[in-house]
Amino acid sequence: MAYQTVNPANNQLIKTYPAHSDADVEAALQQADALYHSAWAKGDIEPRLAVLHKLADLIDSRAEELAKIASQEMGKLIKQSRGEVKLCAQIARYYADNAKLFLAPVKYPSELGEAWVEHHPIGVLLAVEPWNFPYYQLMRVLAPNLAAGNPVIAKHAS
């Protein structure tokens, strides 16, 4: 079964996308799992933060284009779409700037000895998201998990 994107303002077909086969889904899961087990996910956080900074810069550089796409596909006012795009760049930049602090080990006083909390990647995350805010719904899951080293696979809610 194919998926179609239709402009809700005029019912014009924008594009048809093929459905993913079971093999496609399995391949995506395997790639995400390989990334989770890689040095990229488990190693130093700096490369992941650099990706988030680059993502924020790319969103900013193409903000108007992204806003127009969201408005055309979702039937949203362009002002709302611009706000959503701007928010997504801010979210990516926020985690790029702060995740190192958020994920740093935290020591706690204890009468029984040393105690601390460490943060480590937990694995591949599957995000089933509504698409009424197509960029924001993904970014709010992607940015913190990318910083933490957790690959994310997203699927729209059906």
Regions found by a protein language model. Name each.
Residues 105-158:
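Conserved small-residue-rich beta-alpha loop and adjacent elements
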